[in-house]
Amino acid sequence: EVTAAATDVKAGSLRHDPFAMLPFCGYNMADYWGHWIEMQKKVGDKFPKVYQVNWFRKDEDGNFMWPGYGDNARVLDWIVRRAAGEVEAIDGVTGRYPKFEDFNLDGLDIDEAVWAKLFAIDPDAWAAEMDDTEEYFSQFGDKLPAAITEQLAKFRERIAAAKA
């Protein structure tokens, strides 16, 4: 769905709008990112954790794989326990994933096979996403923080390993 802040974008397409701040940010986004990278160095392990979810992943029949609504609280439960150091995570291509046994799936029709599909990735799609992201970042030139370039390179390595 396209929101008022994103009226120049077609529904279903990705808009490069970091933190949904483009209409409101009064300075170069590369400087903005650099600020947050420096803040993380100063604050260390007290810096807020960032998690990404895709509530709308569909199976091969076009059905949503995650039930959504109130069951989204299960994801928040895992995030809180992860941030508190109560559960571990598995390193994956796009980040760190919950372990099946650490996630509250009581009452849901999600077995280990469905769980694996929830976290499966398409390396070719992610490689194309990296191409698009790097093209977007190219507009920032030398202002783009090196930490971002380094993370993109590491991400490309993980994608290549997933393809192998």
Task: Label each PLM-derived region with a short phrase.
Residues E1-A164:
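Conserved NTP phosphate-binding and transfer environment spanning the P-loop NTPase/kinase superfamily
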